[in-house]
């Protein structure tokens, strides 16, 4: 599989590094407006190939490097300038994404486009509108990382292997995201039943759930406060998405996609558990949510829809989670 990564910053290079270690791609191209940076990242990574898996890595600022890509991963975008409104930034990044999609499609006929740039749900919609590709081939990294954070936080509290925890963050990758506690389980045991043993020891389950969710939702803010940016976690999350596409694994991941209809809203992107394979999103799983969770998901979808409409109507969107 050939993977092209647009954006050679810390997120893009972390994705390339994780993808290389997993042996997911036979060829990786890194493209950035700063051609020297992209070339340097590619050269640095290529020197580690003898210790992992055979892979050809190239970098530069020419989109011809993306020719015949199976998957195009987009991490590019720009930061907010002093005095710039969120709408101005969002519209600017939407133009950047549109330009990237147009450039990539000149060299690859029917790639899967994997959006990582934030706000990921809105920009997934932008890529879908610009590309003209089927919905199933436009994927956002969505809440894949948020879901991993939730599972790790549950595992830390319960002293478990996080791979044995099955819980999902759904909706927006941002402050309106929700945890689907009603579907969460440990080894097939519903999470609330699993926690019954702790209740006898004085554990206040609902307060623990609330704290775990808040730590999950606000994780990016804490990381950015400590080190300035997040990139390793999202690098591994995106490499996992690429792995299931390359191997046609039909794994279930909480990626973002543009839903044709949801509770009266058309063409709204958000994350729910989805089956991924070589064609992209093979199917979307119907979650049995509680009434409160369904209301939360509906609210999250409305938040995303409002951000999309703000681009079209020149209205100021609300803030979103940085990563």
Curated annotation (Swiss-Prot):
Main location, first listed in the record: cytoplasm
GO BP term (any one): lactate metabolic process
The entry's keywords: Allosteric enzyme, Cytoplasm, NAD, Oxidoreductase, Phosphoprotein
Sites where the protein binds substrate: 80, 86, 118-121, 146-149, 230
InterPro entries referenced in this protein's UniProt entry, alphabetically: L-lactate/malate_DH, L-lactate_DH, L-lactate_DH_AS, Lactate/malate_DH_C, Lactate/malate_DH_N, Lactate_DH/Glyco_Ohase_4_C, NAD(P)-bd_dom_sf
Gene3D superfamilies: Lactate dehydrogenase/glycoside hydrolase, family 4, C-terminal, NAD(P)-binding Rossmann-like Domain
Name used for this protein in its record: L-lactate dehydrogenase
Lineage of origin: Bacteria, Thermotogati, Thermotogota, Thermotogae, Kosmotogales
Gene (name only): ldh
